[in-house]
């Protein structure tokens, strides 16, 4: 499976003469095709890589692992920013809803039980570890559904505008260092 072929660990997988590697480096997976689906406006994201972490990685392996997390999240963050932008334009009556749709975004994530595992856990291939991850994911999904099921089809459970306000951006009035 190409989705498990991290380029720094495994060779590309060849299928019908075409080489593939993990798509997280480009789009993991792309959200834009979901705009074409007319039966729902909901996008439920199962967040695996944290957007941010407490502390600063200090060792070379920890820094590389964090770079991978940031890389894997980059395309997702760009698409979420575009979804927020289109939604804001629709709310301001600057884009006609119909041709454009306001998407309802939801995020299932469980970072607390995984935090003690540290960064770089994506390289662990132990069966027991996968069973632990499965249990954590099942619990996260159950809790999310219990708390947010009624929001599906009605409203977003992620405040994208607040998410992007919280991300520091360069201050153009200050010189770069």
Locate each region found by the language model.
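Patatin-like phospholipase
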Residues: 1-177
């Amino acid at each position: 499976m190409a989705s498990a072929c991290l380029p720094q660990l495994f060779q590309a997988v060849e299928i019908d003469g075409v080489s593939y590697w993990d798509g997280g480096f480009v789009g993991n997976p792309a959200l834009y095709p979901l705009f074409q689906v007319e039966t729902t406006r909901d996008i439920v994201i199962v967040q695996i890589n944290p957007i941010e972490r407490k502390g600063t990685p200090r060792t070379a392996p920890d820094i590389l692992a964090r770079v991978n997390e940031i890389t894997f999240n980059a395309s997702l963050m760009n698409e979420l920013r575009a979804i927020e932008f289109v939604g804001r334009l629709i709310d301001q009556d600057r884009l006609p809803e119909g041709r454009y749709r306001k998407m309802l975004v939801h995020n299932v994530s469980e970072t607390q039980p995984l935090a003690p595992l540290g960064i770089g856990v994506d390289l662990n291939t132990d069966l027991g570890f996968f069973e632990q991850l499965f249990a954590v994911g099942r619990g996260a999904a159950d809790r999310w559904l219990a708390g947010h099921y009624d929001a599906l089809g009605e409203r977003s459970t992620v405040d994208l505008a607040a998410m992007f306000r919280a991300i520091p951006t360069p201050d153009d009035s200050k010189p770069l260092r």
